[in-house]
Amino acid sequence: MTDLHPDLVRILIDQEEIQKRVKELADQISNDFKGVKRLYIIGILKGAFIFLADLTRHITVPHVVDFMALSSYGRTTESGAVRILMDLREPIEGQHILIVEDIVDTGHTLGYLLNILEGRNPASLHTCALVKKQRDIEAAPVDYLGFEIPDVWVVGYGLDYADLYRTLPYVAELKSEVYSD
């Protein structure tokens, strides 16, 4: 049994469940993009890097990986404003694009990114997220989803609070007293 970090309430998704689902997603993506000359995968930093690394090791179609960094969260809350901190290294016009995110919360950041990338004329544009919060708002579309989770603050497997907890091998709920000032 995995020892629970003292700042956590509970493990929502354990390491074994994550690895099984990552393989399933990679198989689905590989099947859906079979015959494509090259899949251009965009990992959203920092949160998606662990998920992205595990996912791309299982994708069997030819692919390249690039990164973008966006800012929409402060230390504890969503600001509503999205900024591109790091952009792609090359044009994506005519490319088949897969955006890989760690979490879709409100969908605001992903929606912003989709609008930006659609303007760059890719051949296709798809999204993949490890987790999506169950909320009563219309979030951006996620074509390949790992897990739906409750609307709680989560950390682990790339997800963080103040850059901490990112390397935990599972996804867990963070105690509210940790992020409440």
Q: Where are the model-predicted features located?
A:
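PRPP-associated nucleotide enzymes
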Residues: 1-181
